[in-house]
Amino acid sequence: MLFLIISIIVISVLGTISHFLYDISNHNKIIGLFSSVNESTWEHIKIALTPTILWSLIDGLIYRSSYNYFFAKVISLLIKIVLMPLLFYGYKYLFKKNNFIVDILIFYIVIISSQTSFYLLNLVNPVNYFINYISIITILIIFAFYLLLTLIPIKNFLFKDPITDKYGFNGHK
C-alpha cells in the first residue's frame, strides 16, 4: 500500500512538471515528445502516460515476480487514456464550461484510479500467460502511437489545442 501511495505521488508530481517542460526547454522537440506541447486533451493524457512509463522502470523491479504485471500495467495505461477524456468532456458537457480546478482534479483522479487498478490487479489470481503476451504487445503499441501521435496528430478534437485551434507542435502558443 505504501508503494501505491508513493507511485501516485511520484507520477502526479512528474506529470505536473512535464506539463511545463516543453516551455522550460525552449521548445526542444525531443522533450516535446514526452511532455505537453499544447493544451489539447491528448497532451494532457500524455503527461499522465510519460511518468507512468518512467515509473515502470521502478515498479517493474518491485513487481517483477507478479504474474499480472504486464496485464496490470496495460490496464493502468488504458484507464488513463480513456478516463481522462471521459471525465473532462463529461463535466464540460454537463456544466457547459471549463473550470481550471476541476481540470486539475481530473488529472489527479485519473492518476489515483489507474495506479490503484494497477496495484489491485497485481493482487488477484494470475492471468493466463497469453493475456500477458497480448498486454506486452499492447503496451508497445500504446508507446508507438504515443510518439507517432505527437509527431503527426490526428485532426480531431482530442488533439486540437483549444487556445490556438492548432495541432501538435504547431498548437503551441
Residue ranges of predicted features:
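Alpha-helical transmembrane segments of multi-pass membrane proteins, especially transporters
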Residues: 7, 72-80, 103, 107, ...
